[in-house]
Amino acid sequence: MVCHGDYKKLADKTKHFDPHASHLSDRSPINCTACHTAHAKPKLVCNDCHTFDLKMPFSDAPESAKWDATIDAEAVAAAEKSAPRETVDVLVIGAGSAGLNAAIAAKRAGAKVVLLEKHSFAGGNSMLAAGGYNAVGTPQQAKKGIKDTVDQYVKDTMKGGRGKNDPKLVQILAEGSADGVKWLEDMGADLSDVKRSGGAAVDRTHRPHGGMSVGPHIVDVLRAQATKEGVGARVNSRAVKLLLDKDYKIAGAIVHGKHSGYYKIAAKSFCFATCGYGQNKQMIAFYRPTFKDMTSSNNVTSTGDGITMALNIGASMTDIDWVQAHPTVGLDSRILISETVRGVGAVMVNINGERFVNELTTRDRASDAILHQPQKRAWLVFDSNLYKSAKMVQGYDHLGMLKKADTLAELAKICDMDAKTLEKTASDYNKFRKAGKDEAFGRPDMPLGIEKAPFYAVAVAPGIHHTMGGVAITPESEVLDIQSRPIPGLYAAGEVTGGVHGFNRLGGNAIADTVVFGRRSGEHAAAYALKAK
């Protein structure tokens, strides 16, 4: 509860888009002064989670939150010499989707589990996942008459990754995707809508009905389930060092609690779910120097902690220098404009008003196409039908990101494009859509046209979105050492790993990865720990 009623009551009072409505799950523990000036000095909590640079229209505190990455070496050494503060079976690091799934799976397997999150609330990069969850063979697909197969899912994913993926991991991803949907639905998740994302041959991206972002919804469901099942979850708690015993087996970790200092936790097994390094400028400059000046859409806590800890104990890395740029990050911000916007009908044009790419191509190819356009940026253009159908688009409007006009000519003027060119682009696209064939760029799916006023545009440019590589794992999610041998008791899942997505990740595969391999890592970590008792 807050001073003026809880967030649900605030949201229910309005019939139009309301910022409270999108925060019913993850903002409920924080009072109104998190965003507004009221009885206490405000802080822009939104930037903790979303990591963008726009000044919020509902706050007077625009500065971004910064994560303090410093480590007190003397305090770490002292904690290492001390007795463990507690002993657990499975220690999971990172409370995004991968970590939450791992913790729940381990707990259900009978293990004593502690889940650590360095931020002040759970969610991690998963909170920013807007598109959906790719799955094959679901009742949702069957209901819509979608013909899909595991082999097609594997083929699309391997093609999207340019054949650099580990085929065994991709096979597991595809085969486990439908059961992962059921796993989430059994907890209360809504994944009833099915659309198509770039690089997919058919509609297989599952998401909540009404265009809600998939990440916050899934995190909310998983967090509630973890609490219900008694997972020991702690925020403001950062693992800083892995501990091994004399036989090179996992023995625990040193943790830095924001309010409890440095201490030791003894553990029989350990799950990395610490995301990638998209917000670590030094690591980006080292591994992918051509991206060193590029903005990132990632959560501020995506700083490569797990990769660093793994390297320090001799873990093997794979594809570590491969970084994916997302083609549509809001210009001069870090707000990701979801792939869903293109998937449901938006067209992409350059500053002259011309289409230049199949909007549903893979992210790497779309990003490369934008970087070859004048000023290395683009516009997403759509009409009121799309605006009304996708709640996230209304959210972008609330943030002041959209340009709006009653005619395409007027929109072109606002966006400094040539009016006749934009009008012709829209006219040609509408003709292609009605004919059922995009003769210009071969876009396979055109759900909506650019027909009904008012018309909208949002400026975009590529930004760092996913670090493709990370720790090398086996099909059982075991972390490998530099001699390709499993490190006893060490497991990993999600963006901290490499091999699943290859050179380029398809939209919708990240959430699938976190669920399928999150569960897998938790189950195997629990089995190892319980056997070691």
What are these regions (language model features)?
Residues 1-75:
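Short sequence/structural segments immediately N-terminal
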Residues 82-98, 114:
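Beta1/beta-strand and adjacent pyrophosphate-binding region of the FAD-binding site
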Residues 112, 118-232, 236-241, 346-361, ...:
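Conserved N-terminal/central alpha/beta ligand/cofactor-binding core
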Residues 210-268, 307-313:
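Helical element adjacent to the flavin cofactor pocket in flavoenzyme catalytic cores
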Residues 241, 421-504:
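A glycine-rich dinucleotide-binding beta-alpha-beta segment and adjacent secondary-structure elements
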Residues 258-261, 265-330, 517-520:
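Glycine-rich loop(s) and the adjacent beta-strand/alpha-helix scaffold that form part
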Residues 307-309, 315-421:
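An anion/pyrophosphate-binding glycine-rich loop and adjacent beta-alpha core
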Residues 309-316, 423, 514-533:
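Internal hydrophobic alpha-helix adjacent to the cofactor/substrate pocket in enzyme cavities
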